[in-house]
C-alpha cells in the first residue's frame, strides 16, 4: 500500500506531501522526492532525524533510541519508520527530545 506523507516545518519552510509505500522508510522516500531532512546514523540509534507524528501511525519497531514516553507523545525516527496510514509529521524536532 502507498500512503500520503505530509511533512511540515515552519522554521525550515517545509510543507510537502508525497507518497511512501508501506515497506519504504519515510526518510528514504523523502530523499527520493528531493526533500532534505536531517539524519546521521540511518539505523534508528540516534535522534538527528527525529520527527513528531501529529496524524496517522508509523511502524518504527527497528528503532533503539526513543523511550516509550517519547513514542507515546508521537516522536518518530524517520530513518527507520514505515508508514501504516496517511501521516502528518513535524520535522526537525530533535531539540524537543532534550
Curated annotation (Swiss-Prot):
**What's any one GO cellular component for it?**
chloroplast
* InterPro entries for this protein: 2Fe-2S_ferredoxin-like_sf (IPR036010), 2Fe-2S_ferredoxin-type (IPR001041), 2Fe2S_fd_BS (IPR006058), Beta-grasp_dom_sf (IPR012675), Fd_pln (IPR010241)
An example GO BP is: electron transport chain
Molecular function GO labels: 2 iron, 2 sulfur cluster binding; electron transfer activity; metal ion binding
Q: How is the cofactor bound?
A: Binds 1 [2Fe-2S] cluster.
Q: Which cellular compartments is it found in?
A: Plastid, Chloroplast
Q: Name one Pfam family in it.
A: Fer2
| 2Fe-2S ferredoxin-type domain location | 3-95
Can you tell me which residues bind [2Fe-2S] cluster?
Answer: 41, 46, 49, 79
Q: Which UniProt keywords apply?
A: 2Fe-2S, Chloroplast, Electron transport, Iron, Iron-sulfur, Metal-binding, Plastid, Transport
Cofactor section: [2Fe-2S] cluster
- Subunit details for this protein? Forms a complex with heterodimeric ferredoxin-thioredoxin reductase (FTR) and thioredoxin.
| Protein name, entry field | Ferredoxin
State which gene encodes it. Answer: PETF
Amino acid at each position: 500500500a502507498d500512503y500520503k506523507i505530509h511533512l511540515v516545518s515552519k522554521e525550515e519552510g517545509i510543507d510537502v506531501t508525497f507518497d511512501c509505500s508501506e515497506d519504504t522508510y519515510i526518510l528514504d522516500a523523502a530523499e527520493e522526492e528531493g526533500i532534505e531532512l536531517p539524519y546521521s546514523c540511518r539505523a534508528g540509534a540516534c535522534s538527528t532525524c527525529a520527527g513528531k507524528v501529529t496524524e496517522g501511525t508509523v511502524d518504527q519497531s527497528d528503532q533503539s533510541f526513543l523511550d516509550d514516553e517519547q513514542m507515546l507523545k508521537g516522536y518518530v525516527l524517520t530513518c527507520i519508520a514505515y508508514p501504516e496510514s496517511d501521516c502528518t509529521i513535524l520535522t526537525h524536532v530533535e531539540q524537543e527530545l532534550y
